[in-house]
Amino acid sequence: YRNTIAAKQVDPRPETYYYKIDIQPSVIFTLGEHHNIGLTFEYYNLREDVEMTLSNLEQAQHFFIMKGLGYFTSDLGGNYVRRQYNGNSVGGELQYNFKGDVNLIVTGSWARKVEDVTVPIATQPKKQGSVVDDRLKVSLAANTTTRGGYTHSVRLSYQDRAIDGIEYVQKYDNNYESQDWITIWKGIRSQYRTHHIDFNY
């Protein structure tokens, strides 16, 4: 469990509160003298509240919202501007270990994080956007010790990461029965894909 103030911010003006709860249960199975299999499950929940207040309440100020890489939209802020970030991540990892003249470890993991941004307006929060972050990673590590006492280690890893940036178009329904924000349109406005290969000896 982690709770911090002014987390991951670049602009020092907002007041930011952040917490994260992380659970990682794991189990290891031993098969004979040389083989081990491990399983790890990970889940975490995060929440970040950002609030920016103005020292001059008589004049509204412009601020900018980043939407995608290098793309901003301007907005007008009054007494305070608030954003709430709620995220959940689920993933798992499989490990295999061989112990012998050469120690070998093979791992494969996958995780998906979904983070939603909302604007807390009274009791009906308005959706600002969402981010879906998928990560797939495989790695191979081996080491051995020669007769001369020298240890040789090698590690090869590959990671595939895909990020979708989702935006919403919402309209407020002022009917007495609903009085809530209605999503008219939801779509992926930005996509990022990265591949990373790492080799160490």
What are the functions of these language-model segments?
Residues Y1-N3, L39-N45, V106-R112, V154-A162:
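Transmembrane beta-barrel strands of outer-membrane/channel proteins
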Residues E33-I37, V90, G100-V106, T146-V154:
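Outer-envelope beta-barrel architecture signal
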Residues Q9-T16, M52-Q59, M66-S89, V114-D133, ...:
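Extracellular/periplasm-exposed beta-strand and loop segments of Gram-negative cell-envelope proteins
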Residues Y1-A7, K20-Q24, I105-A122:
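Surface-exposed extracellular loop regions of Gram-negative outer-membrane beta-barrel proteins
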Residues Y1-F72, G91-E93:
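Internal, well-ordered domain-core segments that constitute the primary functional module
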Residues G38, E42-Y44, N97, S153, ...:
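Detector for outer-membrane/organellar transmembrane beta-barrel domains
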Residues I23-F29, G92-F98, V138-T144, I197-Y201:
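Residues on the lipid-exposed face of transmembrane beta-strands in outer-membrane beta-barrel proteins
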